[in-house]
């Protein structure tokens, strides 16, 4: 395959679509991803047209996926839709019914192996939902799914009398002195507790491990984070790079 061939990577999420153009070569993992965002697949026509291959991941988003399939067929550009697998890229999935593991989690687990400084690591994705996935060696051991910061806050406001909040997104954890702050800080504390519990599980298995944090909510815990925390904004796209060589 020519080193000049282009591939378009797509992470089709709930809020927006992340895209990155890469040159297909063995050195692609060493190069930084230049990521752009849009909210509709239809806006990607020119990027697709300029590519020799499209590699995409989507959790749900059926209409967007159908449109992507149609565009790629029209422009005669091969499309690979990543799926969770029982075993791939030397990683074994913990789920018996592996197809029910979100492909975003699967790709993040695969990508994190290239980042982690240790054999054991956990991937924390902070978003609408917070997820945790634990890996030792080439084995995904499973994980957790919990409400994310905004979901917790909205649920408190909706289901609890005389509790209210604002749209502030705290980047430090302090004690609230009014209800608004108590709600925001309490939800932030819950996120921190989620990560703390994940670390406890890691310590039960390995003395040395890495915590890799991704997702839009990572700003909540970046300040004063321990040295063994590694932050990455685009783990799903990084995981999609593996599909360029299958």
UniProtKB/Swiss-Prot annotation:
Parts of the chain that traverse the membrane: none
Main location: cytoplasm
Keyword Kinase annotated: yes
Protein residues bound to ATP: 11-18, 128
Domain of life: Bacteria
Cofactor binding, note field: A monovalent cation. Ammonium or potassium.
Subcellular location: Cytoplasm
InterPro entries: ATPase_NBD, Type_III_PanK
EC class (word): transferase
Pathway recorded for this protein: Cofactor biosynthesis; coenzyme A biosynthesis; CoA from (R)-pantothenate: step 1/5
Binding site for K(+): 125
EC numbers, comma separated: 2.7.1.33
Cofactor: NH4(+); K(+)
Catalytic activity: (R)-pantothenate + ATP = (R)-4'-phosphopantothenate + ADP + H(+)
Annotated GO MF terms: ATP binding; metal ion binding; pantothenate kinase activity
A biological process term (GO) from this entry: coenzyme A biosynthetic process
Residue positions of the active site: 104 (proton acceptor)
KW Kinase (keyword) present: yes
Keywords, ordered alphabetically: ATP-binding, Coenzyme A biosynthesis, Cytoplasm, Kinase, Metal-binding, Nucleotide-binding, Potassium, Transferase
Function: Catalyzes the phosphorylation of pantothenate (Pan), the first step in CoA biosynthesis.
Family, per entry: Belongs to the type III pantothenate kinase family.
HAMAP family documented for this protein: Pantothen_kinase_3
Protein name: Type III pantothenate kinase
Lineage: Bacteria, Pseudomonadati, Pseudomonadota, Gammaproteobacteria, Alteromonadales
Gene transcribed to yield this protein: coaX
């Amino acid at each position: 395959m020519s080193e000049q061939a282009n591939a378009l990577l797509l992470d089709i999420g709930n809020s927006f679509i992340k895209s990155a153009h890469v040159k297909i070569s063995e050195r692609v993992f060493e190069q930084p991803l230049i990521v752009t965002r849009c909210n509709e697949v239809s806006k990607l026509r020119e990027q697709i047209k300029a590519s020799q291959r499209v590699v995409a991941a989507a959790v749900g988003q059926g209409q967007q996926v159908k449109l992507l399939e149609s565009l790629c067929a029209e422009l005669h550009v091969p499309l690979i839709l990543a799926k969770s697998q029982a075993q791939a890229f030397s990683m074994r999935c913990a789920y018996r019914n592996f197809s029910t593991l979100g492909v975003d989690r699967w790709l993040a687990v695969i990508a994190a192996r290239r980042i982690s400084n240790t054999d054991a690591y956990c991937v924390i994705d902070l978003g609408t939902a917070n997820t945790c996935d634990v890996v030792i060696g080439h084995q995904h051991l499973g994980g957790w799914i919990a409400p994310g910061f905004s979901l917790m806050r909205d649920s408190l406001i909706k289901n609890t009398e005389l509790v209210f909040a604002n749209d502030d997104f705290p980047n430090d954890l302090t004690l609230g002195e009014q209800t608004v702050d108590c709600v925001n800080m309490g939800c932030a504390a819950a996120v921190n507790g989620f990560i703390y519990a994940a670390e406890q599980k890691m310590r039960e298995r390995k003395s040395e491990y890495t915590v890799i944090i991704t997702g839009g909510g990572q700003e909540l815990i970046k300040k004063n984070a321990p040295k063994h925390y590694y932050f990455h904004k685009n783990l799903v796209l990084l995981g999609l790079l593996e599909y360029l060589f299958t």
